């Protein structure tokens, strides 16, 4: 099984590292092309394009100008340990063993607006470039046109390397839109996490993001290789709901506490 997750806007480049091992991202030539476009943007343009504050725009203009493709542990950090959003709170990779990192490196992929596809130990310099950003480039008007089939091909290579044909989609819609399911050599399975609020079950973004991380951790730490095994997921009060699930959509519900 291959798992896809989204990146995070919040980054951590200071806390202690859970592993010193690292790999290099495989699509840096593409990243360099995007950086050359981004380096031409003024902070004001960045603020408008990304709908962020002037302070954040200045920070990211600086990141773009300082970015260069010679990645070392001194100027970059392993992607799985650099991202720090809700998904990564659930994943809690800072407590992974070396064996956990080995399994994750083979079975987990992070989709990224700048890096395309990242493996957990791939070094990453700090950036902000969400997949939905309407950044004009030589391929078209946005990042979906820029990445084209590249991300899908990379996922196919990872599936082929492990001799498998199941992809567990734990990424957001914004990011998974960069994948072309018709060209993917895999059966797609999407876990959905519903929380009860006022007697009704619905997707609550904050909880759902954390649950995607928890599910990723559950797969990695239990070395799961079959979709059927996902139904045993029971972390933090979630339970599989067979009646609401289908072959390609696994629904997990959590009752109000």
From Swiss-Prot:
NCBIfam families: PRK02101.1-1, PRK02101.1-3. Belongs to the UPF0246 family. One of its GO terms (cellular component) is cytosol. Pfam families: H2O2_YaaD. Signal peptide: none annotated. This is UPF0246 protein ECA3888. It comes from the Bacteria. GO terms for biological process: response to hydroperoxide.
């Amino acid at each position: 099984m291959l798992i896809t997750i989204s990146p995070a806007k919040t980054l951590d480049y200071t806390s202690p590292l859970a592993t010193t091992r690292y790999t290099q991202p495989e699509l840096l030539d593409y990243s360099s092309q995007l950086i050359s476009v981004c380096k031409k943007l003024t902070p004001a343009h960045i603020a408008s394009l990304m709908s962020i504050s002037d302070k954040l725009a200045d920070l990211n203009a600086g990141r773009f100008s300082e970015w260069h493709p010679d990645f070392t542990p001194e100027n970059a950090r392993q992607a799985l340990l650099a991202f720090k959003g809700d998904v990564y709170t659930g994943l809690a990779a800072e407590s992974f063993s070396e064996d956990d990192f080995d399994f994750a490196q083979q079975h987990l992929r992070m989709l990224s607006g700048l890096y395309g596809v990242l493996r957990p130990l791939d070094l990453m310099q700090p950036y902000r470039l969400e997949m939905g950003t309407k950044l004009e480039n030589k391929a078209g008007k946005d990042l979906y046109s820029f990445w084209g089939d590249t991300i899908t091909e990379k996922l196919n290579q990872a599936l082929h390397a492990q001799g498998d044909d199941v992809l567990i989609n734990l990424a957001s819609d914004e990011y998974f839109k960069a994948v072309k399911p018709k060209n993917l050599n895999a059966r797609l399975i999407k876990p959905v996490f519903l929380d009860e609020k006022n007697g009704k079950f619905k997707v609550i973004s904050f909880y759902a993001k954390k649950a995607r991380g928890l599910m990723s951790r559950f797969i990695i730490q239990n070395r799961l290789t079959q979709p059927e095994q996902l139904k045993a997921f029971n972390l933090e009060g979630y339970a599989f709901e067979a009646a609401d699930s289908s072959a390609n959509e696994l629904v997990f519900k959590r009752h109000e506490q």
